[in-house]
């Protein structure tokens, strides 16, 4: 008798995706982040569900409901901090996952890559709206500043902002709708993840060498299930270290002050994972220009596959491109640091230089380096 996992209509899908899936024999730990992102999403949905059982999305009670969760609900503090720091782990894994895609040329799987970009935008939107929910000072002013950016859109801008707010300022209507969107988006993300995997399984995984690996495949289970399990243990350990020892390390102290529309915090800044984009936004003195640069800083990922001039897929054997890639990583870390600094000399100049460098590396220097490498290799 054939094994049920190979015949049952539902189990067959799971079997072909997680058990009998042919996988390249040489994929490194950089291929662990996909499954880690899946784990992050599950942690976020579960902790979020339990938080939603006690949270109230009303401006008068939102802040105190979060306090109530931390003080009075059984292990409420644990659920809340797992959710808040789980978001940080989510973004660490996301950026590593995208970085892996750029380094090893995985972006040549166009459908998978484009769904991935949509997923990135969806996760960023979800995280932004989630940050508004505790209704602290940074929640309120972050929501005000970021939604206000849409007013830079010519002609319809102001109307659009007031439509999103549901009034003439960030208020009860805004908080309620943000909670509704924050609740529904993770399930949309989960559906998109299915599509992401569907497209990935059409082609199979890439590998560090960038060379087709059809002649050398191994079953996903047990080899990569055990490897993923190790990744899970390491990430959960890191998350628990953060949650149990310094849960507020990555947060903003201003968010422990209830939202007050009459009192603006001295430095309005988003969570650490948005600081690089925030620095790019601030580096341009013009409002519309800044907004366009902000959107382009992420949307530029969609252009990367069309700028691939190398005859090789991966950067594994391309030292010039490798150097540029790591300069890009250092540049993003610089932008992250600048995003958290006040708008004054020398930070303004550093931010502008780093922003120009970010776009230059991706749009000009990397394609040029690839052409030079082709020439050196006489291709």
UniProtKB/Swiss-Prot annotation:
Signal sequence bounds: none
Compartmental location: Mitochondrion inner membrane
Residues passing through the membrane, by range: 33-53, 77-98, 113-133, 178-198, 226-246, 288-308, 320-340, 347-367
Pfam families: Cytochrom_B_C (PF00032), Cytochrome_B (PF00033)
Positions that bind a ubiquinone: 201
Cofactor note as given: Binds 2 heme b groups non-covalently.
Cofactor(s) needed for function: heme b
Membrane topology: Multi-pass membrane protein
Binding of heme b b566, residues: 97, 196
GO molecular function, one term: ubiquinol-cytochrome-c reductase activity
Residues that coordinate or bind heme b b562: 83, 182
Alphabetized UniProt keyword annotations: Electron transport, Heme, Iron, Membrane, Metal-binding, Mitochondrion, Mitochondrion inner membrane, Respiratory chain, Transmembrane, Transmembrane helix, Transport, Ubiquinone
Cell membrane as UniProt keyword: no
Principal subcellular localisation of the protein: mitochondrion
Entry GO terms, CC: mitochondrial inner membrane; respiratory chain complex III
One GO term of the biological process aspect: mitochondrial electron transport, ubiquinol to cytochrome c
Miscellaneous comment: Heme 1 (or BL or b562) is low-potential and absorbs at about 562 nm, and heme 2 (or BH or b566) is high-potential and absorbs at about 566 nm.
Function: Component of the ubiquinol-cytochrome c reductase complex (complex III or cytochrome b-c1 complex) that is part of the mitochondrial respiratory chain. The b-c1 complex mediates electron transfer from ubiquinol to cytochrome c. Contributes to the generation of a proton gradient across the mitochondrial membrane that is then used for ATP synthesis.
Subunit organization: The cytochrome bc1 complex contains 11 subunits: 3 respiratory subunits (MT-CYB, CYC1 and UQCRFS1), 2 core proteins (UQCRC1 and UQCRC2) and 6 low-molecular weight proteins (UQCRH/QCR6, UQCRB/QCR7, UQCRQ/QCR8, UQCR10/QCR9, UQCR11/QCR10 and a cleavage product of UQCRFS1). This cytochrome bc1 complex then forms a dimer.
Family: Belongs to the cytochrome b family.
This protein's name: Cytochrome b
Organism: Bunolagus monticularis (Riverine rabbit)
UniProt lineage: Eukaryota, Metazoa, Chordata, Craniata, Vertebrata
